[in-house]
């Protein structure tokens, strides 16, 4: 997939860098696998902002993705690759031998016409989904379940992958891209290979409006606000904020640890790498 830097025919095009994939389907998505997607503007049922920097953006349909990959023993042919506005990875429309169609996260290297499969007896090749106990140690996988049958939760973004480094008893040890080592039940499923669109991080939106198309609103610094809006607000002229960096609600930020999920700490063998 080539990286295309646009000619600066206008100020808004000057810094645009796009990832162009000629293999993507140019028509409409598969209608039976679409669902309505309404926008919240970051508000809850009381109308209050619960998530900042959300609002506007282009209308979208949600593509129903098969994260469980539980149609075992039935081969499926990849009909086409598609763009999905709801995620960074590409998606693949697959047609099973019994005629059912499903969307899956497109693995890197999988193209139209390829045949994929899921289940214990599936061959070891990119795009096939198997329980971790059937995958060779050292393999690169993505779309990994954290609970058997729940559906993939780990490594679903563009270009991501996880390495299976060990198998002991009923658990497998995985090395995540962050450097974290984590135990997962061997019954959980994973898809072989890495996620498509690995050059996604090289793109440049080029202008503020491109973020607005995606429903992302501006981020305002606390020191630019009034005291009523932020702990760093107020003061005459430019100020430093007057205290250690905090969120609008007073919680320390920039490295302050907030994770308190002790229940799953025992599954983490090694913490992620420090930035």
UniProtKB/Swiss-Prot annotation:
Pfam families: Ribosomal_L2 (PF00181), Ribosomal_L2_C (PF03947)
Disulfide bonds: none
PROSITE patterns the record matches: RIBOSOMAL_L2
UniProt xrefs under SMART domains: Ribosomal_L2, Ribosomal_L2_C
Biological process, per Gene Ontology: cytoplasmic translation
GO terms for cellular component: large ribosomal subunit
Domain of life: Bacteria
Region ranges (Disordered): 28-54, 223-275
GO molecular function: rRNA binding; structural constituent of ribosome; transferase activity
Keyword annotations: Ribonucleoprotein, Ribosomal protein, RNA-binding, rRNA-binding
InterPro entries: NA-bd_OB-fold, Rib_uL2_dom2, Ribosomal_uL2, Ribosomal_uL2_bac/org-type, Ribosomal_uL2_C, Ribosomal_uL2_CS, Ribosomal_uL2_dom3, Ribosomal_uL2_RNA-bd_dom
Function noted in UniProt: One of the primary rRNA binding proteins. Required for association of the 30S and 50S subunits to form the 70S ribosome, for tRNA binding and peptide bond formation. It has been suggested to have peptidyltransferase activity; this is somewhat controversial. Makes several contacts with the 16S rRNA in the 70S ribosome.
Subunit structure: Part of the 50S ribosomal subunit. Forms a bridge to the 30S subunit in the 70S ribosome.
Family: Belongs to the universal ribosomal protein uL2 family.
PANTHER family hit by this protein: LARGE RIBOSOMAL SUBUNIT PROTEIN UL2M, RIBOSOMAL PROTEIN L2
Protein name per the record: Large ribosomal subunit protein uL2
Organism encoding this protein: Saccharophagus degradans (strain 2-40 / ATCC 43961 / DSM 17024)
